């Protein structure tokens, strides 16, 4: 049970949920403009993803909200350097939007369903069900099910969006090569410093022995 509930004690569970909710601000604004075409935001994010600097912003958000506190989260914060990176960013925005819609649906309707089940168990009519079920106390036994579904959805969608971000916002081949070259240069520099230090110590010891 403790392992099952452990995600509730992790800050990443809530920051990932917040990350999923951020694009819903755009969707909510659009629904006020034209609720008959809710699919328009999915089209608008495609050209946005082709802008080079968008990849930097998405990478920073992923680092701060999907894997906060980790030194090597695996997300690139460099602007898109090729059309492949731009396309990956556009696909990422679509995936983030889709997962955000799923998270919003679960976060809105599962608590509403719990409220409706409680009303039915107390003898009040349903506000949500289309078939108008008769009130009965036994509906109280069903109230944990939507909460468990919400819990599983929040945790599962958080892991899913993190995995998608690592795939679509991860370093490109050119960035990995540049990082490898940088690490190689640092190792060579450390080796050179160690060699010079060794030679200096050896020279000092030789001088000390000769003087003795």
Which residue ranges define each predicted feature?
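Membrane interfacial helix motifs at helix-loop boundaries and amphipathic/re-entrant anchors
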Residues: 28-44, 112-142
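Conserved signal-transmission helix
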Residues: 157-192
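Perimembrane helix-loop junctions in membrane proteins
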Residues: 63-67, 116-127, 162-173
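Histidine-centered phosphotransfer motif of kinases
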Residues: 184-212
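N-terminal signal-anchor/first transmembrane helix of integral membrane proteins
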Residues: 1-102, 152, 158-161, 165-168
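Alpha-helical transmembrane segments and their membrane-interface junctions
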Residues: 28, 96-120, 196-202, 206-207
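Helix-boundary and loop/linker segments of multi-pass membrane transporters
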Residues: 81-85, 132-133, 184-185
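Hydrophobic alpha-helical transmembrane segments of multi-pass membrane proteins
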Residues: 144-149
């Amino acid at each position: 049970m403790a392992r099952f509930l452990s995600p509730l004690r992790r800050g990443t569970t809530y920051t990932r949920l917040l990350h999923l909710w951020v694009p819903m601000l755009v969707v909510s604004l659009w629904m006020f403009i034209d609720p008959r075409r809710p699919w328009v935001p999915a089209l608008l994010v495609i050209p946005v993803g082709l802008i080079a600097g968008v990849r930097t912003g998405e990478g920073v958000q992923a680092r701060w909200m999907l894997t906060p506190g980790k030194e090597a989260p695996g997300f690139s914060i460099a602007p898109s350097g090729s059309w492949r990176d731009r396309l990956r960013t556009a696909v990422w925005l679509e995936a983030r939007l889709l997962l955000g819609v799923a998270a919003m649906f679960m976060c809105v309707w599962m608590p509403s369903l719990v409220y409706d089940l409680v009303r039915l168990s107390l003898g009040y009519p349903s506000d949500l069900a289309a078939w108008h079920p008769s009130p009965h106390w036994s509906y109280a036994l069903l109230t944990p099910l939507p909460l468990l579904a919400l819990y599983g959805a929040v945790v599962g969608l958080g892991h899913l969006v993190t995995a998608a971000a690592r795939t679509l916002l991860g370093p490109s081949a050119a960035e990995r090569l540049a990082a490898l070259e940088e690490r190689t240069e640092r190792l060579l520099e450390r080796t050179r410093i160690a060699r010079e230090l060794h030679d200096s110590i050896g020279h000092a010891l030789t001088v000390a022995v000769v003087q003795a």
